[in-house]
Amino acid sequence: MNTISPEVKTALVTGTDHGVGFSLAKKLLSRGYFVIAVRIDETEKQIDALQSSYPNQMAIFCADIGSDESVFKASNDIKNMTDHIDLLINCAGILGDMNKNLGDDLDFDEIMRVINVNAIGALRIT
């Protein structure tokens, strides 16, 4: 069941919990886009407040961009909403534990977790 009209420009933005992803979602809403906001943290309420200002112009989905299963579930839910996305903006990213990434004893599991989200995650969501 598609609920977004094909005439409406639709943007999917990841990392909308806060920061750049949140700011871009806000700007796109002000320009008339329907925004599909993807976040990882349901406790971040900033994006919820934005949705209350644009209730008919926004949908929020939770997904861990570092997880195939999580992205697959979110993408199926999004496909039920729309059959088109005009603009995809990948803003989801993590720094990881900097002590494990920059210290003398590198933690390669932590480094791979960061790469999985920041590099592979962008491909996964695309």
Name these PLM-found stretches.
Residues 10-13, 88-89:
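Conserved hydrophobic beta-strands of the Rossmann-like cofactor-binding core
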Residues 17-18:
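Conserved glycine-rich cofactor-binding loop
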Residues 21-22:
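N-terminal Rossmann-fold NAD(P) dinucleotide-binding loop
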Residues 31-47:
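Conserved glycine-rich Rossmann-like NAD(P)H-binding loop of the short-chain dehydrogenase/reductase
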Residues 62-73:
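The beta1-alpha1 cofactor-binding region of Rossmann-like NAD(H)/NADP(H)-dependent oxidoreductases
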Residues 89, 125-126:
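Hydrophobic positions on the long internal alpha-helix
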